Amino acid sequence: MEQVSATARYLRIGPQKVRMLVDGIKGKSVEKGLNTLRFMPNKGAGLVEKALRSAVANAEEKNMDVDGLVILNVLVDQGPTLKRFRPRARGRATRILKRTSHITVVLAEKAAKN
């Protein structure tokens, strides 16, 4: 079973928010996964969809059958955290953490049933 993957890195969204979405598309066909993501109202859905389309393009480049592709796995890892400060009362400041994510989409050809 041949596999192909695509990675979107340094995305400005927290990994916890994206992980909630990806459980809904694992194991589905690419077409069903794209339809599911298209109708989700979250920012992360668009980012995962972009990574999924990139993986499909990589599969086309490897001359794989795009119609028979299945979403094998979607990994969401934490990227570097940007640290920002917000002024507060009495001359103090609080730290704001702006988290980033790395999304890896792994596709595989559907196993032929004998």
Swiss-Prot record:
This protein binds specifically to 23S rRNA; its binding is stimulated by other ribosomal proteins, e.g. L4, L17, and L20. It is important during the early stages of 50S assembly. It makes multiple contacts with different domains of the 23S rRNA in the assembled 50S subunit and ribosome. One of its GO terms (biological process) is translation. One of its GO terms (molecular function) is structural constituent of ribosome. Keywords: Ribonucleoprotein, Ribosomal protein, RNA-binding, rRNA-binding. The lineage of its organism: Bacteria, Pseudomonadati, Thermodesulfobacteriota, Desulfobacteria, Desulfobacterales. Belongs to the universal ribosomal protein uL22 family. Gene3D superfamilies: Ribosomal protein L22/L17. Disulfide bonds: none annotated. GO terms for cellular component: cytosolic large ribosomal subunit. This is Large ribosomal subunit protein uL22. Part of the 50S ribosomal subunit. The gene is rplV.
